[in-house]
Amino acid sequence: MTRYLCAPDSFKESLTAMQAAEAMARGIENADRDAEIRCLPMADGGEGTVRALVDATGGTMHAVPVHDPLGRLIEGRFGVLADGATAVVETAEASGLARLNAEERNPLIASSYGTGELLLAAARLGVRRIIVGLGGSATNDAGAGLLQSLGVRLLDANGDELGRGGAALADVSVIDITTMDPAIGNVSIIAACDVTNPLTGPTGASAVFGPQKGAGADDVVTLDAALAHFARLIESRFGVDVSDVPGAGAAGGIGAALKGFFGAEFRSGVDIVIEQSGLDEAVRWADVVFTGEGAIDAQTGFGKAPAGVAGAAKRYGKPVVAVAGCVGVGIDGLHGLGIDAVFGIARSEERRVG
């Protein structure tokens, strides 16, 4: 009897990671009636991480009312893992670019307020740690909205509360944390982040990610200056320089807020998922490992879930088959990561790598 592990990431806009794993399992069963199969959904810290970790650990999903990037009330979801001590939040859930249509995208006013509401809801459940998946945000406010939703007061020179959005940070003069909800102080925060962009400068949040969120050339200059001003204020208030921290520019600068205010630990998203899901034990059990995601190409080797799965399998000498919606260029280098064959299901294509 052959033992198979099905450990794919989601196929974006088509299948969740668990649905993809179950589809793989059905195919294996059709070919090998005696197969023993385990499904273990994976993710890389981006969109789909909450669902993958909840499914992998037998945790629970929670829905709460939150605000989208433009302040409209929506339903937001976060997960609590089976240990009851770990919650998982994605910035894309409440503050994501997918929440807005193309005409609504405006990082000058978009706010991360809803992500803070998810953090607070999780903290009030009594968890000890919160994993925050950074990515896919519509915001460029350095996490200011997130902080405001937690009770932090950001005031201008007249003592008035700042408006929401990245542009408003140009006017912040005072950071008051005395009104911050005490529940958030009882948790440690782990930032799942696979980009190393700093908060400001030519490789910062505004310059690199601002345009895809709707920022024009002048907006990028405005936002970068506003975030730099906020960073200087954080440094003077807390003694932490967040402007050049690798990953501080993730999710429109939310990484900077998590680091500066909560001392968040930054870790690779796929490493977190591997650890929390128990992938190593599952790989040791298996004879053959299947993984995959929507597209597999040269970028798969840079922090993507299939590469993480293959790395674990390689440590234990297990063969790996990757399945993708489509197969791009540059996959020959994946053999060194432990992927032995790639199947592109869109065109029923098989590619051996190496």
Question: Where in this protein do the model-derived segments appear?
Answer:
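Conserved small/polar residues in nucleotide/adenosyl-binding loops
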Residues: 350-354
